[in-house]
Amino acid sequence: MATTKMAQPMRGLMGLVATAIRRGWMPGLDSMIAKPHDERWQTTIPAPFFKKTNPAIVTEDHLVEARDGFRVPVRVYKRPGTPEGAPGYFFIHGGGFIDGGVAHCDHVCRELADRSGFVVVGVSYRLAPQHPFPTGLEDCQDVLTWMAKERPGGLDPERLAVGGESAGGNFTSALALWSRDTNGPRIAHHAPIYPLTDFTGSKIDWSANLSGNPGVTPELWDTVGAMYLPDRDFTKPMASVLFADHADLPPALVVTCGHDILRDEGIALAESYAAAGVETKHQHFADMPHGYLLMTRLTKRTYETMDLMIAEAKKRF
């Protein structure tokens, strides 16, 4: 696939990030891995470059009891005056399964709640390597179950959608599989955003697309994969969701971007969904880098994507 030039100002920023990581001025994924789990849980996106928050949104913090007794931190977001029975949207952050928490995507959750009128829920799932597969995914399963049972923010449990970016996009697809296979909470719509779908790396062209993933190398990819999947079974379908049976999944929006090593496996997921009969919309932003959804100061594509997520979900409610 031909690569369109990355849009500014992201192109300049990605170049600066790559230089900073290379010279040790800024931590890359490899140095993040060395930090304590709870420090990585608190990772935020640097506000001067990426983040514009929406302070008008009402938030509530909760601890959701997971199946093993751990209390999973979640945050509920809604507009003031949101009526009882609004749809619920579970948004799951990325971070390579080893970084981030609610704070990582707080600005995105606020914006989604404001633009949609939905009750939005964010989560701090447990991270690898201390908590490898399937712990983080099970945390998300338990939070979705809690949403359906406890109706935080007064949400309607019959109108639930799920979306997430990068690792969160992987969990989004895996939640749809789990809901189908276990008769779990009904998911009306799901939106994997530039998702990781294939831990084997078989679809990655390491000679291209790296400008949108500064600091990521084949060696680092393998290291992170082994942290999340210590048994190195990289084809298990609840982790490498591309290899799952996709029949009878809920309608989906799959978003991919041109400057991303995950581009081709995201496209492959959209194609597999469609081939399995899943009602699928695939949106490809050829000029965007991986992680652009978080860059709310830098590109209107973030808002375009959020509005698309909302519009596609509303069609199913």
Residue ranges and their predicted role:
Residues 85-95:
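Short beta-strand element of the alpha/beta-hydrolase
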Residues 103-122:
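Short amphipathic alpha-helix adjacent to the substrate-entry channel of hydrolases
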Residues 297-317:
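Catalytic active-site module of serine/aspartate enzymes centered on a nucleophile-bearing elbow/loop
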Residues 131-151, 309:
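Alpha/beta-hydrolase active-site loop
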Residues 177-232:
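Hydrolase active-site cap/lid region
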Residues 1-76, 317:
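A glycine/proline-hinged amphipathic helix-loop "lid/cap" segment
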Residues 254-256:
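Short beta-strand/loop motif that positions the catalytic acidic residue
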Residues 148-162, 182:
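Gly/Ser-rich "nucleophile elbow"/oxyanion-hole loop immediately N-terminal to the catalytic nucleophile
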